[in-house]
Swiss-Prot record:
Keyword Hydrolase: no
NCBIfam families: PRK10461.1
Keyword Amino-acid biosynthesis attributed: no
Descriptive protein name: FAD:protein FMN transferase
One Pfam family per UniProt: ApbE
Membrane topology field: Lipid-anchor
Compartments in which it is found: Cell inner membrane
Length: 350
């Protein structure tokens, strides 16, 4: 039995910086991009900014890391004392007070969950843990039907409610052991939060990323739009499938081809279908979404990834989303994009 676990450095994130931030070859010294980076939420963050001197850059680095650490304390399922895990551990089914940020994230997640027919399910945590992609250890044997059914009984968006009352925000669950997992949208939220920090700091030209979620504004060091490359679904790093301009938007990619392990001779994807309780097995290997915010993009790409190519395309058409898909076909891949996504393609602009 092969229990080798394969995990990419970016935990399956397959959106790359395209090298257009001029960090190494600026147009002129005054327009050089300052690049800051670090680690958060089990992945990496990167901030590229224009017009920031060395002293401000170091202060900015500290603010970025502090903010991301706070986001992690809000959303982490790996920290038992995070705000989210305190809600998960509580057996009380009465309304539980939470922050406005938490309510915003959960509200959007529930909305996308409904529009993807339950495919984007932030209560899928028990199944994620059962299959070894959460804080629990990886299984040594394939979970049986009884274990899957028991985990599924603790899931379901219908068990979670958002309450806004007299200026206060609450989450309420109707089963004590409901487990909410916001890792599917955490990177998107954190990227948007970094973008707001840049605005607060008076920085109007930036590209920020947390894992596979990115947000940009303004022009890069060469006076051109920030560009992002979508990676080909191969083990070769920096192999580019397409390049897009995302100025003023968020982008996120969900992929099934890097975060997996092998168990009982089968490849186990980290993407779990809430309906079956099992990892996906369809041919869709990558979904990229461009949306007004990275949080929205991060939520949609997860739901569409679960649905598979045919059902996902139907939802994309219904919702008018900007989406790019890569589908396994024989020994190669085929691509599909919505008309809304095509408007962001660099090749379509030139």
């Amino acid at each position: 039995m092969d229990m080798t676990f394969f995990r990419a450095a970016l935990l399956g994130a397959c959106v790359l910086l395209s090298g257009c931030d001029s960090a190494t070859t600026p147009a002129s010294p005054a327009s050089t991009a300052t690049v800051l980076d670090g680690k958060t939420m089990g992945t990496f963050w990167r901030v590229s900014v224009i017009g920031v001197d060395e002293a401000k850059a170091e202060a900015l680095r500290a603010k970025v890391q502090a903010q991301l650490d706070a986001d992690d304390r809000l959303l982490s399922t790996w920290k038992n004392d995070s705000a989210l895990m305190r809600f998960n551990h509580a057996a009380d089914t009465r309304p539980w007070p939470v922050s406005e940020a938490m309510v915003d994230i959960v509200t959007l997640s529930l909305r996308i969950g409904a529009k993807t027919h339950g495919a984007m399910d932030i209560t899928v945590g028990p199944l994620v843990n059962l299959w070894g992609f959460g804080p629990d250890k990886q299984p040594v044997t394939t979970p049986d039907a009884q274990a899957i059914a028991a985990a599924k009984a603790r899931t379901g968006l219908q068990h979670l409610q958002v309450i806004n009352q007299s200026g206060r925000q609450f989450l309420q669950k109707d089963i004590p052991d409901l487990f909410v997992d916001l890792s599917t949208v955490g990177e998107g939220y954190a990227a948007d939060h970094l973008a707001r920090l840049m605005e607060q700091e008076g920085i109007s030209r930036y590209l920020v990323s947390v894992g596979g979620a990115l947000v940009s504004r303004g022009m890069n060091g060469e006076g051109k739009p920030w560009r992002v490359a979508i990676q080909k679904p191969t083990d070769r790093e920096n192999a580019v499938q397409a390049i897009v301009d995302i100025n003023g938007h968020g982008i996120s990619t969900s992929g099934s081809y890097r975060n997996y392990y092998e168990l009982d001779g089968k490849r186990i994807s980290h993407v779990i279908d809430p309906q079956t309780g099992q990892p996906i097995t369809h041919k869709l290997v990558s979904v990229t979404v461009i949306a007004p915010t990275a949080l929205e993009a991060d939520g949609w790409d997860t739901g569409l990834m679960v649905l598979g190519p045919e059902k996902a395309q139907q939802v994309v058409r219904e919702q008018g989303l900007a989406v790019y898909m890569i589908v396994k076909e024989g020994e190669g891949f085929k691509t599909w994009m919505s008309p809304q996504f095509r408007t962001f393609l660099v090749g379509e602009k030139n």
